[in-house]
Amino acid sequence: MTAPGILWLTRDFRLRDNPALLAAIADGPLLTVFFIDRLTMAQGAASRWRLERALRIFDAALRVRTGGKGIVVLRGEAHEILPALMKRLSVRQLHQSDWPTVEMQALQDRMRAALRPLGAGLILHPGHLLVHPGAVRSGNGGAYRVYSPFARAVRQRGPDRPAADAPPGIEPCTEPLGGLDLSTLDLAPDLHRGRAALERFAAPAGEEAALAGLDDFLDRACAYPRERDRPDLDATSRLSDHLAVGEISPRTIWARAMLRAEISPEHAAGIDKFLSEVLWREFSWHLLIGFPEMPVACWRSEWEGFPWQKDGASLIRWQRAETGVALVDAGLREMWLTGQMHNRVRMVVASWLTKHLLIDWRAGLAHFADCLTDWDPASNAMNWQWVAGCGPDAAPYFRIFNPERQAEQYDPRGDYRRRWLAGFDRAAGPEAVAWIESTPRDWHTGPWRAGPSAMLAEGRKAALAALAHFRANTSET
């Protein structure tokens, strides 16, 4: 038997522009292996549910290209299982799409150690970024810490390589290897009552859905600069969960967007603004690679001494979307039901927790990690630190979002709040009712009620006082 090419599948569930997949195919008949391991199960429940959808759809796509051979799904630790399999099949190199988090790098190190006695190696392929970390440097030769010059440098340089086409046909490995039945797989048993809501309201998954969504967005990109901050409108690309699991690559997005801007100049300004948001994602990953502790430690280390409040009751009310602040609660309920939250609303929700309630940003990040289908460790850590004021290129400490003013400006008719809040100002819609049906039974799920109006001003006043006192007693500048 010809030795196969093995793809260790952890991310990048796509055929197009998938360097790891193409490299494995070049080695020999394709064997794609996915492991249900400790790292997979450590992800948030909604993220695991979304990963399972990506896995099923990619398996079906591979079966079409291979004549019926899909993904071999195994339960256990990859570094304990793959070396013996590679030895039996006479395979000397293993291919994986890189995902440079601390946890994944530790797993990759264990895999390298397990393969070393066999004379085999692990080859990592860039699949989730436009440019390789370190390819763009600031004037002093170091990594960029501010977004604007980073974005200019990446735009001037362009992606590392063109987006590759999907392989037209794939020769599969025919060695019988068993594996779990994907049709009965359940990676998120802890979703409980929330599963039905995600299945009903979450966006379509899969590579084809991602490409269709991108093309649909580019058709209306001219309105993006004007409407992107409006949660009551369908004005964004909704590609974040596709990017999170790798159903579409940023290189594909970049190439299609640039081509559309050239063909349709009337959309060029909107596409340019959209690509600036793609570059924010890129920036966050370059920051994470340079500062791997970003999801758990303040970028500005002096902020570790900030006196965050240990207010368990307020945190629980925030997690349960019962703060009494309409825009905040609407956003948290949108996240619970759909696995996503509009970006403008995310900033308001995060500001309420970290500024009005003075609760540690890491508590908010943990809740988002459990509830988001588009969970991205780099983007979410950077954005939480940006709002809290402790991150690179962060918002100034006195930047405290006023939820009522934000709602007046960006949800002027109340359509967004009305959609998610039963009792906001009229009969509940299907989404608001679904919130009651999908949350744990011991939560308070009566009609939504606004909190006292004075709490906005009082919270802002207390936050400014605490932040000013902190700055006066630290080296924060």
Predicted regions and their residues:
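Trp/Phe/Arg-rich N-terminal binding region typifying the photolyase-homology
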Residues: 1-166, 270, 333, 379, ...
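Short charge-dense sequence patches
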Residues: 1-14, 30-38, 63, 200-209, ...
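Active-site-proximal binding-pocket segments
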Residues: 120, 234-422
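Glycine/tryptophan-enriched, flexible segments
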Residues: 141-298, 410-411, 415-477
